[in-house]
Regions:
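Short loop/edge segments at beta-strand edges and connector loops
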Residues: 31-33
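Long, positively charged amphipathic alpha-helical accessory segments at protein N-termini or as interdomain linkers
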Residues: 2-29, 39-199
Length: 199
């Protein structure tokens, strides 16, 4: 299953980080589609979100006649308090939380990722979808999609599909459609999805 949908791996890796951080430090993090990990730093509404980026995930995939190769990169700000804050600082300040070492966090991330990969391989994206949505930041978020010709359309984020691409709903047309992460930039603070600039 994963060989036909390698794009889902970045979402599983992000979820593994969120689960591992919660398990090892008690800190609850969230996922910004497609691959960033954030800490909610204050009370907010859908339009006023106060977030601090704590990490991210990147996956590079290649295939040949021998199969699929994935290279996974995971970054978490564990100890660097500047320019914003570190995970261990947040954990120390949180009641019931505590610092975690690199080795313990990496082991926990890999354990969670292995479990998630096994679950998806056995039963599909649906096996982990609800856990993913508990951690992600975008349920019912209004955004504006801009296509390559510059046309804009207001839509509502409704989820991710079985490949990990963003599903949105347009009230005007009544249609759902998919927004791919490749070639698009998601400015969550501005509520805008637009084609990435090519240099």
């Amino acid at each position: 299953m994963l060989a036909s949908r390698p794009s889902i791996v970045q979402h599983l890796a992000a979820l593994a980080v969120v689960q591992a951080v919660k398990e090892t430090t008690g800190v609850a993090l969230n996922i910004k589609w497609p691959n960033d990990i954030y800490l909610r730093t204050a009370a907010e509404t859908v339009q006023n979100i106060n977030l601090t980026k704590m990490g991210g995930v990147v996956v590079a995939a290649s295939s040949n006649r021998n199969g699929l190769t994935l290279v996974l990169g995971v970054g978490v700000n564990l100890d660097n308090a500047k320019p914003t804050c570190s995970l261990n600082r947040v954990a120390e300040d949180q009641e019931g939380g505590g610092k975690v070492g690199k080795e313990k966090l990496i082991a926990s991330i890999l354990n969670h990722l292995e479990l998630l990969l096994d679950m998806v391989e056995a039963g599909g994206w649906e096996e982990v979808e609800q856990e993913y949505y508990k951690a992600w930041l975008h349920s019912n978020q209004p955004v504006r999609v801009t296509d390559k010709e510059g046309r804009e359309e207001d839509v509502l984020v409704v989820g991710v599909d079985k490949f990990g691409f963003l599903r949105v709903h347009c009230d005007k047309s009544g249609e759902d459609f998919t927004v791919f992460d490749d070639g698009n930039s998601f400015d969550m603070m501005a509520g805008l999805i637009r084609p990435k600039s090519r240099v």
